C-alpha cells in the first residue's frame, strides 16, 4: 500500500514538472521575440534620425546658396543704380552741350547781323564818298557856297571816319566772334565725341548688367524651385518621422507595460522559488525552482498560480490518506 502511494506521488510530480517546463519555454520565446522587435524599432528610429539630419544639412546648404544669390542680386542692383546716376549725369552734360550749341547758334546770328551792319556801313561810306564827289563837282560847277559845301564835306568826312572806325570795330568783333565760334564748335565737337563714347560705354555696361541680372534671376528662380522641392520632401519626411515617433512612443508604452508584467511575474516566481522543503505531519513538500527568465503575459502568471494550487491540493490529499 505504501509503495502504491509512493509511485502515485512520483507520477504526480513528473506531470507537474513537465507542465512548468512547457510554460517556461513559451515565455522564453515571447520574451526573445519582444526584444527583437524592440531592437528593430530602435534601428528604424536611428535610421530616420540620420535621414532627417542629412535633409537638414542639405536645406541649410541650399539656404546659404540662396542668400549668396540674393547678395549678388543686391550688388547688381546697386551697380545698376550707379549706372543710372551716371547716365543722368551724362544727360546733364548733354544739356550743357545743347546750351553751348544754342549759344553758338546765337553767336552765328550775331555774326550775321554784324556782317550785315558792316556791309551797310560800307555802303553808307561809299554813298557818302559819292555824295562828296558829287558836291565837289557841284561846287566846281557852281563855284558858290564853297564854305558851306566844305563844311558839309568835313561833316561827311567825319561821318565817314566814324563809319570806318565803326567798320574796324565791327571787323575786330567779327574776327573775335569767328575765333570764338570756331573754338566753341571745336569744344562742342570734342564734347560730343566724348559724350558719345561715354554713352556707348555706359549702354554696354548697362546691357551687361541687365544680362547678368537676368542670369541671377534665373539662378534665383532655380534655387527657389529646388528649395521648394526640398521643403516638400522635408515635410513628407517629417510627417513620416512623426508617424514613426508615434509608433515608437506606442511601442515604448507597450514595452513598459510588458516590462511591468515581466517584473510582476518575476516577483511571483521568486516567491515560489523561496518555498523551502519542510515536513508537515510526516508529509514532505518538494520546493519547485523552474529556470524562468521572463513571462510574456498575464495568462502565464495565472497558469503558474493554478499549478501551485494544484500541487497544494495533491499534498493535502496525500496527507489525508496517511492519517
Swiss-Prot record:
It is a single-pass membrane protein. Residues 1-297 are cytoplasmic. Residues 1-55, 73-92, 120-143 are annotated as: Disordered. GO terms for cellular component: extracellular region; mitochondrial outer membrane; mitochondrion; plant-type vacuole. The keyword Acetylation does not apply. Residues 28-278 form a coiled coil. The keyword Membrane applies. One of its GO terms (biological process) is mitochondrion organization. Residues 319-323 are mitochondrial intermembrane. Residues 13-26 have a biased composition (Acidic residues). Keywords: Coiled coil, Membrane, Mitochondrion, Mitochondrion outer membrane, Transmembrane, Transmembrane helix. It comes from the Eukaryota. The chain crosses the membrane at residues 298-318. It is found in: Mitochondrion outer membrane. Plant cells silencing PMD2 show enlarged mitochondria. Homodimer. Interacts with PMD1. Involved in morphogenesis and proliferation of mitochondria. Does not act redundantly with PMD1. Is not involved in peroxisomal proliferation. This is Peroxisomal and mitochondrial division factor 2. It comes from Arabidopsis thaliana.
Amino acid at each position: 500500500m505504501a509503495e502504491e502511494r509512493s509511485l502515485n506521488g512520483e507520477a504526480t510530480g513528473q506531470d507537474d514538472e513537465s507542465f512548468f517546463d512547457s510554460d517556461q519555454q513559451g515565455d522564453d520565446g515571447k520574451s526573445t521575440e519582444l526584444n527583437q522587435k524592440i531592437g528593430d524599432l530602435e534601428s528604424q528610429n536611428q535610421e530616420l534620425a540620420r535621414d532627417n539630419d542629412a535633409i537638414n544639412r542639405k536645406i541649410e546648404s541650399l539656404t546659404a546658396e540662396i542668400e549668396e544669390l540674393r547678395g549678388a542680386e543686391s550688388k547688381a542692383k546697386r551697380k545698376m543704380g550707379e549706372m543710372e546716376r551716371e547716365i543722368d549725369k551724362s544727360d546733364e552734360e548733354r544739356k550743357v552741350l545743347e546750351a553751348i550749341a544754342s549759344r553758338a547758334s546765337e553767336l552765328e546770328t550775331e555774326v550775321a547781323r554784324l556782317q550785315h551792319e558792316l556791309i551797310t556801313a560800307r555802303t553808307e561810306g561809299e554813298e557818302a564818298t559819292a555824295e562828296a564827289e558829287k558836291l565837289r563837282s557841284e561846287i566846281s560847277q557852281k563855284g558858290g557856297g564853297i564854305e558851306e559845301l566844305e563844311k558839309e564835306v568835313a561833316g561827311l568826312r567825319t561821318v565817314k571816319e566814324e563809319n570806318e572806325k565803326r567798320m574796324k570795330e565791327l571787323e575786330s568783333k567779327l574776327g573775335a566772334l569767328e575765333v570764338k565760334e570756331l573754338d566753341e564748335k571745336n569744344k562742342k565737337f570734342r564734347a560730343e565725341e566724348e559724350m558719345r563714347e561715354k554713352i556707348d560705354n555706359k549702354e554696354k555696361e548697362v546691357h551687361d548688367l541687365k544680362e547678368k541680372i537676368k542670369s541671377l534671376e534665373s539662378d534665383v528662380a532655380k534655387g527657389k524651385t529646388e528649395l521648394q522641392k526640398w521643403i516638400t520632401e522635408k515635410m513628407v519626411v517629417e510627417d513620416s518621422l512623426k508617424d514613426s515617433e508615434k509608433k515608437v512612443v506606442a511601442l515604448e508604452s507597450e514595452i513598459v507595460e510588458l516590462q511591468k508584467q515581466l517584473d510582476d511575474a518575476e516577483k511571483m516566481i521568486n516567491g515560489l522559488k523561496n518555498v523551502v522543503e519542510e515536513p508537515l505531519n510526516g508529509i514532505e513538500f518538494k520546493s519547485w525552482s523552474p529556470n524562468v527568465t521572463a513571462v510574456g503575459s498575464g495568462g502565464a502568471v495565472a497558469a503558474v498560480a493554478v499549478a501551485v494550487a494544484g500541487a497544494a491540493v495533491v499534498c493535502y490529499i496525500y496527507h489525508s490518506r496517511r492519517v
